Swiss-Prot record:
GO terms for cellular component: cytoplasm; nucleus. The keyword RNA-binding applies. It holds the Pfam family RRM_7. GO terms for biological process: negative regulation of cytoplasmic translation. It comes from Caenorhabditis remanei. The keyword RNA-binding applies. This is Cytoplasmic polyadenylation element-binding protein 2. Keywords: RNA-binding. The gene is cpb-2. Cytoplasmic polyadenylation element binding protein that binds to and regulates the translation of specific mRNAs.
């Protein structure tokens, strides 16, 4: 693997960032072409040998048919040479003509059978051989499976690979007899099957690396599962949508706790954070007054390092916080007044009790009500796999029936596969770190292969696409990266700055900026033995390079470059 690809795949600073990503064995193009050519040559030899055998069989059957016709003609001539005396004697006798008529009828029937039977036998042998030959051919298997009503379930990886292999072999070494037979027999059936199974797509892109689409839209992308051949590994964070307002957090916990320990979270649940869908926003520093979680004091609130700790850690942390002075120095002694303050705070709703109000429902409970969707934070990845196995699949996605206290409710489950966080369009194209664009505002359900499909259609020359995921749950942050192989395509994307991402039911404007890499050296003053750290990057086409602080001021002191704005990490 080249240095640029390693840098691109490890830019998050987490070793397990890419999940089961780039694990395929790298092979060189000449070796792959040689193997393909050998396989195709073997297949061509088999086809030629088979057709030669068929020609020999036809010649033998024709020679037999000619010999039998000659025998029949000789017998007819011999019958015509019968003397006239025998014919006169036969006419005189009355019962004899009936017998002769029956004999002549039988003889004519036997002759007809002799004429037809060899041809029928030879044809049956020929067609039986042909059927046996074509039943094992992969292209005929493809046609049979495409005409089947349950063809959607048969689109697996082995089948698609087999189809691609045979299609390429037919394109490189065409066989006119085979193609003519396939067109004559299956043209009508394949047209009807394709009209039913393959719907038109307005966003189709003709790319050699895109495989046959997988029609299971619930779990996978509409493009075939592209690069990961290992086991499916899910994020421990699962989106649950379609929740009515009558469903409470306790109902959600009671239902989903059968799969394992979990927490329920949604944006604005904890007012100390902007959004809990991105754990990096919260950080490790939480507010001094945190609201209770659903585990009833068995785990601290969302955002801490280990959300599944015991109650002793929370109480000890609370006592330490109350034992600290304003300056941050520990007093070391917990007085009786401090204990009463702790109990009062807990009863007020900051520790473990529910907030009380005179009117029944308090304002804090209103703030903590979900917005029609929640996030399930499971302790183990196995729980997510069990949840996915219990869901039923439809065209819109995965669904499960939530058994609440009021009535059963159909809710949507949206898991995230770690392999969907990156997509390499071509393993043989090197990645230029200067041609990587940052994509902000990416919808979280969007997969890397779908983002690559969109940018390939819009700008072209896409090499690699990555979705930014958090380090804790491996869930999408809402941003991504696109690496281009062409400078013009990259410049066009950067100059557009904003573009509307229109993909199926997603319609959102995303932002495109140059991606800033850490630990880059100044390209103006750094040499082989003197590396100067470059915290600035100039995206203008006049500069388009990394600068250290002195070089930035030096190169942008000219009035023509005053308007250049630097790109800094985190801004």
């Amino acid at each position: 693997m080249s240095k640029s690809r390693r840098l691109f795949l490890s830019m998050q600073g987490d070793d397990d960032f890419w999940g089961n990503g780039d694990r395929l064995e790298e092979k060189k193009l000449p070796s792959i072409k040689q193997e393909k050519s050998k396989v195709m040559d073997d297949e061509d030899l088999e086809d030629r040998y088979y057709f030669k055998q068929n020609k020999l069989g036809r010649q033998q059957s024709e020679s037999r048919h000619e010999n039998e016709e000659n025998k029949v003609s000789q017998e007819e001539k011999w019958n015509l040479r019968v003397p006239l005396e025998e014919s006169i004697l036969i006419k005189k006798e009355e019962p004899v003509p009936e017998m002769e008529e029956s004999e002549t009828i039988i003889a004519s029937e036997e002759e007809q059978l002799l004429e037809t039977s060899p041809s029928v036998d030879t044809n049956e042998e020929f067609y039986n051989n042909y059927r046996n030959y074509f039943q094992r051919r992969p292209e005929v298997i493809f046609l049979i499976r495409s005409m089947d009503e349950n063809a959607v379930e048969n689109y697996d990886k082995e089948f698609i690979d087999l189809y691609e292999k045979t299609r390429k072999s037919l394109e490189v070494c065409p066989n006119p007899e085979l193609n003519q037979i396939l067109r004559c027999e299956c043209s009508s059936n394949t047209s009807t099957a394709n009209s039913d199974n393959r719907l038109p797509n307005n966003h189709a892109v003709v790319v050699s690396n895109f495989r046959e689409p997988d029609r299971r839209l619930g779990r996978y992308s509409k493009y075939y599962y592209h690069h990961n051949v290992g086991p499916e590994v899910y994020s421990r964070k699962v989106f649950v949508g379609g929740l009515p307002g009558c469903v409470k957090e306790s109902d959600i916990l009671n239902f989903f706790s059968r799969y394992g320990r979990l927490q329920v979270d949604w944006p604005s649940k904890h007012f100390g954070c902007k959004s809990d869908s991105d754990p990096s926003v919260c950080g490790d520093a939480t507010s001094s007054f945190q609201q209770t979680s659903h585990l009833a004091m068995s785990s601290p609130p969302f955002g801490q390092i280990n959300p599944f700790m015991s109650d002793h850690s929370t109480t000890s942390s609370e006592t330490q916080n109350f034992g600290m002075n304003r300056n941050g120095n520990g007093g070391g002694v917990i007085t009786h007044g401090m204990v009463r303050m702790m109990n009062a705070a807990r009863n007020a709703g900051f520790g473990g009790g529910e907030p009380r109000s005179v009117g029944g429902e308090s304002s804090e409970e209103k703030k903590q009500h979900h917005l029609g969707y929640v996030f399930l934070l499971f302790e183990k990845e196995r729980s997510v796999r069990e949840l996915v196995s219990d869901c039923f699949e439809e065209e819109e996605g995965l669904f499960i029936t939530l058994e609440s206290s009021i009535e059963p409710i159909r809710v949507q489950i949206r898991p995230w596969l770690l392999a969907d966080a990156e997509f390499l369009m071509d393993f043989n194209v090197p990645i230029n770190t200067k041609l990587v664009a940052f994509i902000g505002g990416v919808p979280r359900p969007l997969k890397a292969v779908e983002l690559a499909h969109f940018f390939e259609q819009t700008y072209g020359n896409v090499v690699c696409v990555g979705i930014d995921i958090d380090n804790k749950f491996k869930y999408p942050r809402g941003s991504g990266r696109v690496a281009f192989s062409n400078y013009d395509a990259y410049v066009q994307a950067i100059t557009d700055r904003y573009i509307v991402l229109d993909h199926e039911d997603i319609h959102k404007r995303v932002e495109i900026k140059p991606y800033f890499f850490h630990n880059q050296s100044c390209e103006e003053c750094s040499s082989r033995y003197n590396r100067q750290y470059a915290p600035f990057f100039c995206p203008s086409l006049e500069c388009f390079q990394y600068y250290c602080e002195p070089c930035w001021h030096k190169m942008h002191s000219h009035p023509s470059r005053f308007h250049h704005m630097p790109v800094v990490k985190g801004i």
